[in-house]
Amino acid sequence: MKIYLIKSFGLKTIDKVIHKLESFELSEFSYGYCHYDLLPKNFHFDNKDNITFFDFDFLGKGYLVNDIMTFWIHLSLNATFNKMSQEEADHSFNILIKSYREIRQLSEDEIAAIPYLSFAFWIFYMGYHIEHFDDFSNTFFNQKFVIERVELIKTLTNKYCHFNT
């Protein structure tokens, strides 16, 4: 299955993503512990606007922008599936960035890296499904799922990743 994923994306796309990420000054990106899965299903606001985070199974060290990236994935999926317009997704993302910057620094390069980091996240997540087949993904991880997910990742990559050819 891993070979299929690599062939589906083509080594050229993977190389382009790696090259693009290497074009950033990654040593200047903020680094620390990341949740790595800040999708709406993994946090809750109570009636006093307190937030609770849960589902820490992907927790690890990395670039802090990865947490913003996972929320960006949520917005980009909603825009791609027409659950919201691209303008609404961009507006929501800009609110997140503005609010985040009120608390900590976030560079333009970190923001620009998000679509490429999301590609890496999708590859990781597909690997997660493979590695945890017996205890997690066996009910849905089949050929149809893989084909649909690969096509989705291709669509998102084509839409949001801008490679200098």
Feature map (PLM): residue ranges:
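Protein kinase-like catalytic core scaffold
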Residues: 32, 52-54
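Conserved catalytic-loop position in the HRD/HxD motif
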Residues: 37, 55
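ATP/Mg2+ or Mg2+-diphosphate-binding catalytic cores
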Residues: 125-165
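An alpha-helical support segment within catalytic cores of ATP-dependent transferases
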Residues: 1-36, 46
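Activation segment
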Residues: 46, 51, 59-61
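All-alpha amphipathic helical-bundle segments outside canonical DNA-binding/catalytic cores
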Residues: 108-118
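Active-site activation/catalytic loop segments of kinase-like enzymes and analogous catalytic loops
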Residues: 65-104, 121-136
